[in-house]
Amino acid sequence: APPGFTPFRSK
């Protein structure tokens, strides 16, 4: 996974 990638993002 690329740096700064998050499976869950705060909306």
From Swiss-Prot:
Coiled coil: none annotated. The keyword Repeat does not apply. It comes from the Eukaryota. Its main location: secreted. InterPro entries: Bradykinin. Pfam families: Bradykinin. Expressed by the skin glands. GO terms for cellular component: extracellular region. GO terms for biological process: defense response; vasodilation. Keywords: Amphibian defense peptide, G-protein coupled receptor impairing toxin, Secreted, Toxin, Vasoactive, Vasodilator. The keyword Secreted applies. GO terms for molecular function: hormone activity; toxin activity. It is found in: Secreted. Produces in vitro relaxation of rat arterial smooth muscle and constriction of intestinal smooth muscle. May target bradykinin receptors (BDKRB). Belongs to the bradykinin-related peptide family. This is [Ala1,Thr6]-bradykinyl-Ser,Lys.
